[in-house]
Swiss-Prot record:
Gene3D superfamilies: MFS general substrate transporter like domains. Coiled coil: none annotated. Induction: Induced by galacturonate, repressed by glucose. The keyword Heme does not apply. Disulfide bonds: none annotated. Keywords: Cell membrane, Membrane, Symport, Transmembrane, Transmembrane helix, Transport. Member of the exu locus which is required for galacturonate utilization. InterPro entries: MFS_2, MFS_dom, MFS_trans_sf, Na/Gal_symport, Na/Gal_symport_CS. Belongs to the sodium:galactoside symporter (TC 2.A.2) family. This is Uncharacterized symporter YjmB. The chain crosses the membrane at residues 25-45, 52-72, 95-115, 123-143, 167-187, 192-212, 249-269, 279-299, 310-330, 332-352, 389-409, 420-440.
């Protein structure tokens, strides 16, 4: 089927449903992605503070500046992909997964190296390497996210591949959270252990990206680049004229910052509040393992309640569990049970988000006459990078404010502060995210179905 739009020709295979193999392969893409991304989110702050010897507040500044830089460059990367000419038989997005993942793996190892120089020299290297890593990540993650919208317009298939993507993401988070620390403690010198272990996982990430590249197919094909010139104003126009995108961006800033600050602070909580850093592996085995329950039931929940209400339910579960966990005394068993419930809750809206992005891409095409998958996804990714910079900054500056001292016995104030960063901030942020998706997001599943029908009628 061919659909004539204002400035390009789109080839769409609308009838064919996605096979289980293709859905799983798409999920393997985020599985591979997590073997590089999660390493930075979980372990890089601790590497900076405890191995490289960078003060916590300065380490937080690295995350803030580097992620803000990546947030700014994301729309540029996305637009450059959308405006690329001479798209070959491999498709618009898939080649980036094949080549970009190899580059990203190398960059992942480099961010876990620290030259034997002054603190100023270490800061310069950390800033430079992490900012370059961010660009490399954008050239992989944006095409990967855009690929989902190019594979199908079927709402059920989109929910399905979003579910597989979330399973892949949780699978990688599960493995990196459980397996990395036991491997690191086997090295007498952490300056050697970190790059070796991270290099092992990054290589596995490349393999899983290759599976995604090989087995996924682009069916909604743009045969021409947009005729409108690539300018800052064209990118801004795409953003401000898409109200569902604006709302999703705002929601994501709160939801992802909550999710990431949890990942970063758990290692500190295990080491200092519970007194044994190796407990982190066992806790994560249960916590992240439990979160698969939310993802498994996601398609059925969406059928029953719709995407919007299902996301609100998930946020509500997580908020309640985190607040109760914060108020109770620190106990490894109680903490693990409540943290598991919270992760089940947050896994639900996190999984739905990817389907919402694809819906928003269709909305943008319906409203403007131009289909810009990569630009739209990069603008959404902009919010994720802002959230990541916020969580990294809050983690670092928060540790400084509460009086955290690396590799030492912490004060009572510091222990309470670590617990607040781990549980109280996420509860507040997720409550705000629940309000935003519930009252500000207006694109319903029924409206999206009508939009897809309108687009097909133009054929």
């Amino acid at each position: 089927m061919r659909t004539e739009l204002a400035n390009k020709v789109v080839s769409v295979e609308t009838e064919k449903r996605l096979s289980l193999k293709e859905k799983m392969s798409y999920g393997f893409g985020d599985f591979g992605n997590g073997f590089m991304f999660d390493l930075g989110q979980i372990y890089l702050l601790k590497y900076f503070t405890d191995v490289a010897g960078i003060p916590a507040a300065m380490a937080g500044g690295i995350f803030l500046v580097s992620k803000l830089f990546a947030a700014i460059t994301d729309p540029i990367v996305g637009s450059s992909i959308d405006y690329r000419k001479n798209i070959g038989k491999r498709g618009k997005f898939r080649p980036y997964l094949l080549i970009g993942s190899i580059v990203l793996a190398v960059l992942t190892v480099l961010i876990f190296l620290s030259p034997n120089v002054s603190t100023t020299g270490k800061l310069i290297y950390a800033y430079a390497s992490y900012m370059i890593w961010g660009i490399g990540y954008s050239f992989v993650n944006i095409p990967y996210g855009s690929l989902g919208a190019a594979m199908t317009q079927n709402s059920e298939d989109r929910t399905s591949i979003s579910t597989f993507r979330q399973i892949g993401s949780l699978g990688a988070l599960f493995i990196t959270s459980v397996a990395v620390m036991p491997l690191l403690v086997k090295f007498d010198n952490p300056k050697v252990g970190y790059p070796v272990v991270m290099g092992l996982f990054a290589a596995l990430g490349v393999f899983w990206f290759y599976i995604c590249y090989r087995n996924c197919k682009e069916r909604i094909i743009i045969s021409e680049a947009p005729k409108e010139k690539l300018t800052l104003s064209s990118v801004v126009k795409t953003f401000i004229t898409n109200k569902p995108l604006l709302t999703l961006v705002l929601m994501t800033i709160f939801s992802i910052s909550a999710y990431n600050i949890k990942s970063a602070m758990l290692v500190y909580f295990a080491q200092y509040n519970l007194g044994n850093v190796e407990l982190m592996a066992y806790m994560n085995f249960i916590i992240i393992g439990s979160s698969f329950l939310g993802v498994v039931f996601l398609p059925k929940l969406v059928k029953m309640f719709g995407k919007k209400r299902t996301a609100m339910i998930g946020f509500g579960i997580s908020v309640a569990a985190d607040l109760i966990n914060f108020m109770l005394p620190s106990n490894v068993y109680v903490f693990t049970i409540l943290a598991s419930i919270a992760f089940i809750g947050i896994s639900i809206p996190n999984g739905i988000t990817w389907a919402l992005v694809s819906d928003i891409i269709d909305y943008g095409e319906w409203k403007s006459g131009e289909r810009k998958e990569a630009t739209t996804y990069s603008l959404f990714n902009f919010s994720r990078k802002l959230a990541q910079s916020l969580s990294g900054f809050l983690s670092g500056i928060g540790l400084g404010i509460i009086g955290y001292v690396p590799n030492a016995v912490q004060t009572a104030q510091a222990l309470i502060g670590i617990k607040a960063l781990l549980l109280l901030y996420p509860a507040i942020a997720l409550a705000l995210a629940m309000f935003i998706i519930g009252f500000l997001y207006k694109l319903t599943d029924q409206q999206h179905a009508q939009i897809v029908q309108d687009l097909h009628q133009k054929s």
